[in-house]
Amino acid sequence: MKLAVFTDSSAYLSAETLQREDLFVLDIPVNIDGEEYVEGINLSAEEFYQKMAQASELPKTSQPSIAKLDEILTSLKEQGYTHALGLFLSSGISGFYQSIQYMVDDYEGLTIAFPDTLITSAPLGIMVESVFNWRDQGDDFASIQDKLAIQISRTSAFIMVDDLDHLVKGGRLSNGAAILGNLLSIKPILYFNDQGVIEVYEKVRTEKKATKRLIEIIKETTASGQYRVIVIHGNAPEKAEELRQHLLDFGLGSDVSLATFGSVIGTHLGAGSIALGYIPVI
């Protein structure tokens, strides 16, 4: 089996994974005040947050290019590939997953699967890494898909948003709820539900209590089995490092890494947001 793995630029990937010759990353363009950027090419995460703060309206992200995906899939067979696996951002965030399902049977001699990851950012990047690890240890395509299905079903992220007004602009919270929330210092905790949609999990008074509750949730959800936990932030590295230390103090293992929300999720959540993602080690 020669396996090609696809993902998109919403995935937070390690430098080592990005060097994989069998990895193909589709760009997700982001439009800020009429200018188009691609994160990692002409826009860093830090620059994105700076530009978003100065923009007259929320940035808009597009879907990855189906034409580019088709072009690469068409070329794979002549390069000796037999299988292709695409791990793209959640169908609850983007319509891309639905848009490409027709392509699965369109390439003769190539076995293709596009499962719905129901997630994005760092957990998505770890899924990509996991697929390469399973392949390298000799797993066949069916076994990789089985392990991936288990991993997807037990992966999520819980998020604390700094700016409620940002959720209003993105249509995820009513203006009245945001005004009341700001008056009462309410910090909603959001999460990726089992359809991969970001929704409110619960509402907590004050950031301190919300942070404590985030840690409790992760402790509960990762109690059985081995998990990797990731602190993901929207241009708030000091807050993220502080939360990482809290996790270590609570005994949530030594494998707690840091990552940054890129433009796709950063547009929804705004600067200062912070999340705890978790994914099982399989």
Curated annotation (Swiss-Prot):
Q: InterPro entries, per this entry?
A: DegV (IPR003797), DegV_C (IPR043168), DegV_domain_contain (IPR050270)
Binding, hexadecanoate: 61, 94
Q: Carries keyword Ribonucleoprotein? A: no
Please give the Gene Ontology molecular function terms for this protein: lipid binding
> What keywords would UniProt list here?
Lipid-binding
DegV domain location, by residue?
3-280
Keyword set includes Cytoplasm: no
Q: Name one Pfam family in it.
A: DegV
Function statement? May bind long-chain fatty acids, such as palmitate, and may play a role in lipid transport or fatty acid metabolism.
Quote the protein name from its UniProt record: DegV domain-containing protein spr1415
